[in-house]
Amino acid sequence: VEFTVENSKLTIHQLDVQSNDSVDAFANQAPERIDLLVNNAGVADGRWRNLNEIDDGWALEVIDINALGPVRVVKALYGKMSHDSLTNVAMISSLMASIDDCHMGRSYAYRASKTALNMFTVAMKKEAIEDNISFVILHPGWVKTDMGGDRAPVEIPDSVSGMRQVLTTRTLENTGQFVQFDGEILPWQIVSVRVIAGGPFPDTGMTV
């Protein structure tokens, strides 16, 4: 890949999010203070793959890249993001991670990987609040990219400018939200119920 760098402040480093050694090497080259981290690396699994087409090895690789990759990066850079002012961490996810919005099914590995990324992020925010780090899970929209295809309704500049605007609204109070590029808060799932085996079902007296 070739880049034309017009801004001398921009530096480009190679990074393999599946490799702890690569992530650590990148972290060692990174500035001592980081105020914004955008985890954008990801792969698709073939959008319309059905149940019979699931390949175990490829599914695990998709999950490793899309879910664990960003966690590796956050771990490696955490010390440089924890300082006296707010640091924003953006996890690029997808509406396809929403359990409530899984109307068409398929894309098993991609959906599962992004749902796992969302849960990793919500769990990490609990620890990061005390270190002045705010997380946001971003859905960039269905964008006209190599992955999104020509039928996608959202242009790249619109998606990017929208996500930049969302980042300006981040605080420790709204950390961990699942937000679309236009600012809409997205659903996690239809209902959240905690069931404890052998105990009473809350507010019903039922035992399960």
Where are these regions (language model features)?
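Rossmann-fold cofactor-recognition segment
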Residues: 5-21
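Conserved Rossmann-fold cofactor-binding substructure of NAD(P)-dependent oxidoreductases
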Residues: 18-33
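Short-chain dehydrogenase/reductase
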Residues: 27, 74, 121, 160-163
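Conserved hydrophobic beta-strands of the Rossmann-like cofactor-binding core
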Residues: 37-38, 42
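Catalytic loop of short-chain dehydrogenase/reductase
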Residues: 43, 50-62, 71, 82-129
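C-terminal helical subdomain
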Residues: 137-138, 149-190, 194
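Short, flexible catalytic-loop segment of classical short-chain dehydrogenase/reductase
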Residues: 140-146
